Amino acid sequence: MFVFTKKGVLSPLQSISLLAIFFTSMGVATVSPAMAKLAAQFPSNNYALISTLPTLFIVPTTLWAGAVAGKKIRYRTISLVGILLFLIGGIAPFFLTESFTVLLVCRAVFGIGVGLRASLGNALVMQYYTGKEQADMLGYGNLISNFGGVHLQMVAGSLAEYGWNYTFLAHLLGLFSLLLLVFQPEPEESCCAPTVTAEVPNGYRHSLLKSAGFDHRGRIATALTAFLLFLQQLVSYPILMNISLLFEHRHAGGATVAATALSLYSASGCLIGFFFGKIFYKLKRLTLVFGYFIAAAGAGILGFAKQTEILMIGSAIMGMTSVLLITSAYAILGMYISPNQSSLAIAIATGVSNLGGFASAYYLNMLGIITGEKLFTPIYVLMGVYTLLATAFMVYDPLRKNS
């Protein structure tokens, strides 16, 4: 079914279990369709923390998991603890409805669970795959991530119609990942397995270091990936978080319609995820140029359109380009690090990315203070930032192979 380097093959169940790690990776956005209801339920509190607080705990947890995964603790053990905390912290607010503080504690537990698993999927892909197969699998992983996002958000949006706390029952879908965990493959270099050096294609990877450190190009690639993902989360997450408010402002529908828009956001990402390998190896660095320009156009649609159908198209474009840009960043990183460094490199990039998600709440408040408006200003800022990045990557080629 899927190639397991050039030395073996994963069973179908192992392949499915590996990809199932990605299913819950968009879990933080599950409550987005219900943000309007949550804002009404907690008018005197910073309701945005319900969505952004988990990312604060995702950051250190992701870094810790990346440092110990396969070295001191099995990948499977970390994944198990992560999915259990995902379920407990995700579902508990349905029952604990009296205190905003208790709700935030639950979201913190949930964030730790997400963080433990956040980097494992991409790290395992880089452990097992190289070249085009690696790009394909990164794309498939994002396909599953967005597939999970579609279902989590659709279920959450539908449940929100019964009450704000019903939204959190959508996290029960994480049980699918828990059931498949028993088949999750364990890398050969795991702490409990003999060490094997993976095959490294000439021209794409670099010799393994004597220590856990990276060479110069590896450090640059990790820093660039982390910066791009941080910036993407910082400027795009407020738009995703406010999508239900945007639809209400445009009189384009309630929580269910907003959930449909968010599902289109994820569904379009699924489509790109399926074809990512072919797109990336065809366009090379132009993947970034194309992605940033089209994302800016999608944001423009959300900022200026008024009809429900057109807003849906804008949401779909944003989702498509989000996956394209995120996966491109990881694919570029994979060309400059060794398989044994993948868990730490991915953890750093993912952790910094989620730090951008947490900072987005304060970034949104800052925009509100400066402009007096927090719904459309983030859209206009994203358009400007992405246009600048697209222009920069027309000049700078991160894929050039310097010695």
Identify what each model region corresponds to.
Residues Y140-P185:
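Helix-loop-helix hairpin linking two adjacent transmembrane segments in secondary transporters
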Residues C106-S145:
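Cytoplasmic helix-loop-helix junction between adjacent transmembrane helices
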Residues T167-F183, T377-V395:
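Symmetry-related core transmembrane helices of the 12-TM Major Facilitator Superfamily/SLC fold
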Residues L116-Y129, L324-S338:
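Intracellular juxtamembrane helix-capping segments at the cytosolic ends
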Residues T77-I91, L286-I301:
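Structural signature of the two symmetry-related core transmembrane helices
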Residues T61-R74, I272-K284:
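Helix-to-loop junctions at the C-terminal end of transmembrane segments
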